[in-house]
Regions:
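Ferredoxin-like alpha/beta domains used as RNA- or RNAP-binding modules
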Residues: 1-195
Length: 195
C-alpha cells in the first residue's frame, strides 16, 4: 500500500514549501502529471495561495464545491494540480506554471484565459476503427475521427471543460516554446533550430 504523505526533506524540489517547519507533506494522488510537476490541491490552498489557514479549512473550502480544476468541481484534497492546469477558486482563476527558479507557481489569469489550456502531445496510437488517439502531458487521451498531422512534441490548445481541440501549435523553427527543464527553466524562447 502506498503512503499518503512523504517527508518534507524528500519532497520534490519544484514545490515552493519550507522544508524544516514541519515534518510531513501530503502526497498527491496518482494522476497524469509527474510527481515533480504537480502539487496536492489542499497544500496549494493552504501553503501556496494562503486561502486556508490549515488543512481543516482547506477541506471545508473543497466541500463547499467552489474549487474547480480544468473546469470541473474538485473535492479531493490530494488531487494533483500540475503544470498548465487551470485552478478556479470562486471568481479567481490561476494557471500553474514554473518560475525561473524551477518552482511551481499559480499565477492569476483572466476569466477568458481560464477557458483554454495548452497540452503537449506525448504520443499517438491508432485504436480500433481506424481512429487516432492523442496522448497529452497531463494524462488526457483525446480520440479523433480523422488522422491529423499532430506530432510528438507539438502542443494542442484545448477548451475547458469539454476538451475539444481548438488549435494546433507545431514544434518547428520560429515557433515559441515554454521551457520546463534545464538552466533556462520557466522562460519563453523562440526555436532557432531543431535536431
Amino acid at each position: 500500500m502506498s503512503r499518503s504523505h512523504h517527508k518534507r526533506l524528500g519532497m520534490p524540489r519544484t514545490w515552493p514549501l519550507t522544508r524544516k517547519t514541519n515534518i510531513w507533506a501530503q502526497k498527491p494522488n496518482p494522476s497524469g502529471h509527474q510527481l515533480e510537476m504537480c502539487m496536492p490541491l489542499g497544500i496549494v490552498l493552504r501553503d501556496v495561495l494562503g486561502i486556508a489557514h490549515n488543512m481543516r479549512e482547506a477541506k471545508r473550502i473543497l466541500h463547499s464545491r467552489i474549487v474547480m480544476v480544468d473546469g470541473r468541481i474538485e473535492t479531493d484534497r490530494a488531487r494533483g494540480v500540475g503544470i498548465m492546469d487551470v485552478l478556479t477558486v470562486g471568481d479567481e482563476n490561476y494557471r500553474c506554471i514554473l518560475d525561473k527558479n524551477g518552482k511551481l507557481r499559480y499565477r492569476p489569469i483572466a476569466k477568458k484565459a481560464a477557458g483554454s489550456k495548452i497540452c503537449r502531445v506525448m504520443g499517438k496510437t491508432t485504436v480500433k476503427g481506424g481512429k487516432t488517439q492523442v496522448h497529452l502531458h497531463d494524462g488526457r487521451n483525446i480520440l479523433l475521427d480523422e488522422s491529423p498531422d499532430y506530432k510528438t512534441g507539438d502542443s494542442l490548445v484545448i477548451s475547458l471543460p469539454d476538451q475539444k481541440v481548438s488549435s494546433h501549435l507545431e514544434m518547428k523553427k520560429g515557433s515559441t516554446a515554454y521551457l520546463t527543464g534545464g538552466s533556462h527553466i520557466g522562460e519563453i524562447a523562440k526555436i532557432k533550430d531543431q535536431e
